[in-house]
Amino acid sequence: MQTYQKDFIDFVIGCEVLRFGEFTLKSGRQSPYFFNAGLFNTGARLGRLGEFYAQTLTSGGIRADVLYGPAYKGIPLVAATAIALARVSGEEIPYAFNRKEAKDHGEGGTLVGAPLQGEVLIVDDVITAGTSVRESIEIIRGAGARPCGVLIALDREEIGQSGKSAVEEVQDSLGIPVHAIVGFRHLIDYLRGSGRVRELAALEDYRSRYGTA
């Protein structure tokens, strides 16, 4: 685990985006942790999140001509990432996002921001069913550009009904890589390193039942 990944886990625990306990997921599973990206709801938190996205891009050597944020959750995420890249690395990557409803006046259409061209990286919080990613790919290809990957905050690394994780399904069916700031394995490494025995045992048990590895 890289230093920025440990710092990210410290950050999300500190602002209670990541909580440990007993939670019922939409799937009906009982999870020992919950990741609520809706709590990136202040300027300071959003700015810090953008820095972690930017660090993931630069440390992984991930290249893109345009960043794209799917409405609605992806809009502040893609803007924060573009700002952080410009401030931290001096790299100016244009960004765009879509509207849910087409606009029939002004510039019109469903796309806002930079033109979608070349290699386009999708920025989102998590992948649950992959619906948002599939819709984004249709939009990007429809504009004549090429989706080159997806950047998310957390990869849960747990299998669904298909026997694959949501991220694996996206990668296999759509043929594009998914990059995450951290994965479930990093949460386990973090808990092991910080001596949080009870939470560690709960997450290891969860991984033994639902984990991808």
UniProtKB/Swiss-Prot annotation:
Positions bound to 5-phospho-alpha-D-ribose 1-diphosphate: 26, 72-73, 99-100, 103, 105, 124-132
UniProtKB keywords: Glycosyltransferase, Magnesium, Pyrimidine biosynthesis, Transferase
Pathway note: Pyrimidine metabolism; UMP biosynthesis via de novo pathway; UMP from orotate: step 1/2
Swiss-Prot/TrEMBL cofactor(s): Mg(2+)
GO biological process assignments: 'de novo' pyrimidine nucleobase biosynthetic process; 'de novo' UMP biosynthetic process; pyrimidine ribonucleoside biosynthetic process
PROSITE patterns: PUR_PYR_PR_TRANSFER
Molecular function GO labels: magnesium ion binding; orotate phosphoribosyltransferase activity
InterPro entries in the cross-refs: OPRT (IPR023031), Or_phspho_trans_dom (IPR004467), PRibTrfase_dom (IPR000836), PRTase-like (IPR029057)
Catalytic activity: orotidine 5'-phosphate + diphosphate = orotate + 5-phospho-alpha-D-ribose 1-diphosphate
Function statement: Catalyzes the transfer of a ribosyl phosphate group from 5-phosphoribose 1-diphosphate to orotate, leading to the formation of orotidine monophosphate (OMP).
Protein family (similarity comment): Belongs to the purine/pyrimidine phosphoribosyltransferase family. PyrE subfamily.
Subunit structure: Homodimer.
Record-given protein name: Orotate phosphoribosyltransferase
Gene that encodes the chain: pyrE
